[in-house]
A protein has these predicted regions:
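Substrate-binding pocket helix/loop in short-chain dehydrogenase/reductase
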Residues: 66-67, 71-79, 172
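Active-site helix of classical SDR
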Residues: 90, 126, 134
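C-terminal helical subdomain
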Residues: 149, 170-198, 202, 209-211, ...
Length: 230
């Protein structure tokens, strides 16, 4: 398993988990918003393991903000961070994935790309675009490479903790049929399924990992806009 991100300490923690399972981990620190880092990651992976079978695109994120507070630059940055990175990373990986007999790409999207709620216009629109990118890639790369997406709901991560209050957490739990916030392992298990032979007849799909929510359970309490807004 090859892992890459900007924070090497986090990567080393993942590597230890991988090695505890009796597998080999390759740590490649880098900024994956930079195409050169992506090419280097693919090259390092192929050099170390001799092949590339699976790509999981998990770069992304954008903080919540009211519509009138979202600048053009931040809107475009959200697309670059959530969509363009997946496009570029996949393009760098595909020449090697084509040599595999069981190649798969998994894009980590979000429930925000399927449901609308206030405060997530940049993030949600970008994640919806990532879902559509997944469908197009599935068509482009079939039959050699399967491409699917995961749409997590509320997951207990540092990003969520940054704005999660006690009241908001209670509302999110009550708005989720399974009555809990998801864990990182819930998303990881879905990724393992989509990367494995168990999903060999699945491509171009979006797998919700959201506790069964049919609408956004995240209400930031942003006020209605009125005629006094200028």
């Amino acid at each position: 398993v090859a892992v890459s991100a900007r924070t090497e300490s986090d990567l080393q923690a993942v590597a230890r988990d991988v090695e505890a399972c009796g597998r080999t981990a390759l740590v490649v620190p880098g900024d994956l918003s930079d195409r050169g880092s992506m090419v280097s990651l693919v090259a390092s992976t192929v050099e170390r393991f001799g092949r590339l079978d699976v790509l999981v695109n998990n770069v992304g994120g954008t903080g919540p903000a009211a519509f009138l507070d979202v600048s053009e630059q931040s809107f475009e940055r959200s697309f670059s961070w959530n969509v363009t990175t997946a496009f570029n990373m996949t393009q760098a990986a595909v020449p090697h994935l084509l040599d595999s007999d069981a190649a798969a790409v998994v894009n980590i999207s979000s429930a925000a790309g399927r449901h609308a709620s206030r405060g997530f216009i940049a993030y949600g629109t970008a994640k919806a675009a990532l879902i559509q990118l997944t469908r197009h890639l599935a068509a482009e790369l079939a039959p050699r490479i399967r491409v699917n997406s995961i749409a997590p709901g509320a997951i207990a991560t540092e990003a969520l903790a940054g704005f999660l209050t006690e009241d908001l957490e209670e509302a999110m739990v009550s708005g989720t049929p399974l009555r809990r916030i998801g864990m990182v392992d819930d998303v990881a298990a879905a990724a393992v399924y989509l990367c494995s032979p168990a999903s060999s007849y699945v491509t171009g799909q979006v797998l919700p990992v959201d506790g069964g929510t049919q609408a956004s359970s995240l209400d930031l309490g942003l006020p209605d806009l009125g005629p006094s807004v200028r």
